[in-house]
Amino acid sequence: MIPVLDTNAWIEKLRELERPGADNILAFYEHRFGAICRDPRLMLAPLDDHLVHRGDGVFETIRFTERKVIHLDAHLRRLANSAAGLSLTLPCPIEEIRDIVL
């Protein structure tokens, strides 16, 4: 029989799952919470996200080296332009994203 888990048991199972590449993820930002999490096993895409139900999304990878973010403003401009090109609204203004990253 398939078990029915309560919330705590579900989260515990989720945290026990192996996540390939998790050792390469230092943290992620969850815009719905307005917070950063350092447990990559909790990084999930919600079902109502454009990425899931429409298959579109904008991604930007930023290099962080020697305690500095490299070319942040150029990355943020590209992020905004890419989102506009797909008619997507960013979850918050670019200035706020900049503050979150820094």
Predicted regions and their residues:
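Conserved alpha/beta cores of soluble small-molecule-handling proteins
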Residues: 1-102
